[in-house]
């Protein structure tokens, strides 16, 4: 048996993303959403495709929000979801590793686990969030759909690169280009503006394909060296004027530079099975008693 065949499969779930996806399809109906999600995870548990499953819940991050007030400020705050999410987590923690951190984003926890575990296992992230596509350069896979407990739709390298095609349909060339390209473009869904307003897409692609330095950890000194490789004087001047914006966007968007010390932020979360709470949302006991 080959080394690739020997590798265990590990699933990391972006629970907040899955909750929002299922809730939107069910037009905000909490009982239907909880039942559907429990049905999904019961199937995943029974099918045993993955040797280990991590369910990641969001904490209340401070640093990013404190430093940049617009970060994710365009998202609707829905306090009503926290009670059903806790009820849902009370079931999932009986069967899976539910993890999170009080003052860190779920995305950071997912990225930390994925990049470390991918060194010895085949790691799959269940989410529809494009933020995780930057991790594909490390062999991490993103699953966007399950069918009968099995991973059904896995984003290919070609599909990932096509998500960042230009108006002529030209995709990015390599997976490592995704992060710096997004840094320059920004992400309106997270309230992150373009790092260099008005910069042409062709100039951004030139920078990430020809000038960006990928073999060293990102820093402002590295950025200055990258800018030094740009031959066009006008483009170089634009980059110099926007150094602070580029640094800001990189800090907000990068999931590849999380230090080993981040591990101390991750906690295993376990709730006693909330049967009373479940009875308000779920009619079938077999959906939470597997």
Each language-model region and where it sits:
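Extended two-metal-dependent nuclease catalytic cores across DNA- and RNA-processing enzymes
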Residues: 2-4, 27, 50, 73-281, ...
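Domain-level signal for Mg2+-assisted phosphodiester chemistry and nucleotide/NA-binding surfaces
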Residues: 2-94
